[in-house]
């Protein structure tokens, strides 16, 4: 017999707790506990035990109340009811003190692994977390309905980023309109930033814009290097004129001007990398930034763009130095390299950039790859034209959109937020009854729908003044002061995401098969995905809000979902017996499958995640096998829209070992250990792993660490036939 607590956890029934609670009510009234009182308390406790079934806490308390009211001690019943009411008030009151002190004193491991790119020991991060704790408390007590809070706590759904929800102007992620801001000027902290006249200045201003923009949102941001390309030409022209004035001939002027321009690009990219990785935004972290490298975005400045891309890749291969002065893998920016006809074929003009990208991926985990070819098949606009554009941050994709003039527009658009459904919970709640599954599925989706509507309405009250750099000065719009952002939330300009997690566990429980079986498992998985999309289409049509299906990364939520499933359903082999659940539609990390089969299979599901998705393969050390990386890249171009290769990039600061730092089980806790010297001090090692699309460098919670440990290596260090 178990008692189900308010947060969904289960505890073995303890009769003594009932006896003690009733006894306290008797003592409160009688000032003592008589033998008759003891007898009555024991009688109630025995009765509840005799029911021999799982009960919710509220059900247990209701029984106690009923039994006392049915007795001749209604005064004790009233005392118990009053006590229960007061306890409820305490639960509803501000309960942040304990959480904040745990953070400040470092007594709760949760904060050290809540985000793989945040160090909870640093005061700027602590300040952000304290603000987040307060926001979450306000959100839970005042802004969300009780049933949504309960569903979130029980792991039935996940209401993302409640720690930023109290403010009504914070959205999720965006494609920053850097071109507009650099060409037409912008304002930062009431200072006018005019159009720069050289690449180095433009690159520096870009980092200031990035920091300001990401301080006014909570998700990832993306810029394109295309916005910087015109300033390379400006710099070149300045250098050319300088040498021309010295009386040099045309060829000499061109030669020296190009040398100086390349040196400026090198300096500008280095400054950009230092700034992005050293500056801290108001979220207490480096900006979660992605940088798009897409030659197809410009014809006029394609040569200049190629020079910038080349330098970004070269410097990323080199890395940034740690405190020991050793070059290591940096987390940001994430690099998004678009594969196209101009760079994918060995005889194409820019194939050398793809070779450089492959070397970079083998050593530093980035760039990730977007196939222009496949994306244009997936993203069709209202004119019937295929479109290619980057994701916002790590994986969130906008839907195709045409402006008033019928032209495609992507930069300057954003995502309003995410609510995720736990698909394994739907499956387990149905007890393998397919009719019941679809009934619960629809109910849970409506719960998500209501939560998403609340997100939308929270933003709908915002005016442009609340984040001028976003709404007035070009990052997302150029609205007037005091103007509502309401129009930007409708008719496809921005998206709002219905996330999903654990498709594999859901399918495995309901069918007994993985969705890789090319049979009943895959058919059911595709049906689930199609119904998610059907719901989004239904909501979108009714409300003119761009709902979109999103493959949620669940970086730390994977652990929460796994624990909640065990609390609600116990340990079920192959479903709830791990400390994580599988991301989105992914093949489970432990399943043995070759890289090409995995990518081909997942491409089918990626098309059904239009609001965001990314696939990956896990690789061994490929620094000496770049040819294998090239073959995978070519496969990505022909078969899947967006994918990445996970390699390892570690360094032990104690002994200098730069191979893979291993995960070990130390007394039931997973930890990291240098296989060379045994060092386990996190502060004396650098570990870089992909956790949710981004590279994590600050270690991970137990669930995510377990997932990393179980990853099957799809591509070993051997030649691909």
Predicted regions and their residues:
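Short, mixed-charge aromatic SLiMs
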Residues: 45-50, 68, 524-538, 710-721
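Alpha-helical scaffold elements adjacent to nucleotide-binding pockets in ATP/GTP-utilizing enzyme cores
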Residues: 17, 21, 63, 307-312, ...
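Metallocofactor- and cofactor-centric catalytic cores in central/energy metabolism, strongly enriched
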Residues: 265-269, 273, 508-509, 704-710
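Long insertion/accessory domains within large nucleic-acid-processing enzymes
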Residues: 676-721
């Amino acid at each position: 017999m178990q008692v189900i607590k308010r947060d969904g956890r289960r505890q073995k029934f303890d009769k003594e707790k009932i006896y003690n609670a009733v006894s306290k009510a008797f003592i409160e009234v009688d000032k003592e506990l008589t033998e008759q009182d003891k007898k009555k308390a024991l009688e109630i406790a025995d009765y509840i035990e005799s029911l021999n079934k799982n009960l919710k806490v509220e059900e247990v308390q209701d029984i106690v109340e009923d039994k006392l009211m049915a007795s001749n001690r209604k005064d004790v019943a009233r005392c118990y009811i009053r006590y229960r009411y007061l306890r409820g008030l305490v639960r509803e009151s501000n309960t942040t003190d304990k959480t904040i002190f745990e953070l400040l004193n470092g007594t709760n491991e949760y904060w050290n692994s809540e985000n793989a790119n945040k160090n909870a020991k640093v005061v700027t991060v602590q300040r952000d977390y304290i603000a987040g704790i307060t926001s979450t408390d306000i959100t839970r007590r005042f802004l969300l309905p009780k049933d949504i809070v309960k569903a979130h706590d029980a792991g039935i759904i996940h209401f993302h980023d409640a720690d930023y929800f109290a403010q009504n102007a914070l959205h999720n992620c965006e494609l920053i309109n850097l071109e507009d801001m650099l060409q037409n000027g912008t304002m930062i902290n009431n200072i006018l930033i005019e159009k720069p006249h050289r690449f180095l200045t433009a690159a520096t201003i870009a980092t200031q814009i990035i920091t300001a923009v990401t301080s006014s949102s909570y998700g990832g941001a993306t810029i394109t290097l295309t916005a910087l390309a015109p300033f390379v030409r400006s710099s070149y022209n300045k250098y050319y004129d300088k040498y021309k004035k010295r009386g040099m001939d045309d060829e000499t002027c061109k030669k020296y001007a190009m040398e100086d321009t390349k040196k400026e690009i090198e300096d500008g990219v280095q400054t950009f990398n230092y700034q992005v990785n050293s500056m801290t935004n108001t979220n207490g972290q480096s900006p979660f930034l992605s940088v798009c490298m897409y030659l197809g975005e410009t014809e006029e400045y394609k040569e200049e763009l190629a020079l910038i891309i080349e330098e970004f890749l070269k410097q990323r291969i080199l890395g940034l130095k740690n405190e020991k002065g050793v070059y290591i893998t940096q987390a940001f920016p994430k690099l998004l390299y678009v594969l196209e006809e101009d760079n994918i074929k060995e005889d194409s003009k820019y194939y050398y950039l793809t070779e450089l990208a492959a070397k970079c991926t083998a050593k530093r985990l980035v760039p990730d790859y977007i196939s222009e070819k496949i994306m244009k098949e997936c993203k069709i606009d209202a004119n019937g034209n295929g479109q290619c554009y980057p994701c916002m941050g790590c994986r969130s994709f906008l839907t195709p959109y045409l402006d008033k003039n019928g032209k495609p527009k992507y930069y300057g658009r954003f995502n309003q937020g995410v609510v995720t459904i736990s698909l394994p919970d739907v499956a387990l709640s149905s007890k393998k009854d397919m009719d019941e599954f679809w009934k619960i599925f629809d109910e849970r989706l409506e719960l998500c729908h209501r939560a998403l509507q609340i997100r939308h309405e929270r933003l709908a009250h915002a005016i442009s003044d609340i984040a001028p750099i976003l709404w007035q000065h070009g990052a997302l719009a150029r609205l007037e002061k005091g103007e509502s952002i309401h129009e930007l939330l409708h008719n496809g300009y921005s998206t709002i995401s219905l996330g999903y997690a654990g498709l594999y566990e859901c399918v495995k429980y309901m069918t007994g098969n993985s969705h890789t079986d090319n049979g009943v498992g895959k058919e059911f998985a595709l049906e689930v995905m199609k119904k998610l999309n059907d719901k989004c289409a239904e909501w979108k049509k009714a409300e003119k809000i761009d709902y979109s299906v999103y493959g949620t990364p669940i970086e730390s939520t994977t652990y929460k979902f796994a624990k909640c499933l065990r609390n609600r359903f116990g340990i079920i082999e192959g479903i709830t017996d791990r400390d994580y659940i599988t991301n989105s539609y992914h093949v489970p990390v432990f399943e043995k499958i070759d890289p090409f089969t995995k990518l081909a299979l997942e491409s089918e599901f990626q098309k059904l995640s239009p609001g965001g998705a990314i696939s990956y393969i896990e690789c061994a050390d490929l620094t000496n096998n770049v040819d294998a990386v090239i073959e995978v890249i070519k496969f990505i171009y022909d078969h899947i829209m967006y994918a990445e290769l996970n390699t390892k990039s570690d360094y032990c600061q104690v002994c200098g070992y730069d191979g893979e730092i291993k995960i070990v089980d130390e007394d039931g806790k997973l930890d990291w250990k240098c296989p060379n010297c045994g060092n386990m001090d996190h502060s004396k090692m650098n570990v870089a792993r992909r956790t949710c699309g981004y590279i994590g460098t600050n270690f991970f919670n137990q669930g995510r660490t377990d997932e990393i440990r179980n990853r099957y290596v799809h591509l070993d260090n051997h030649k691909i036939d």
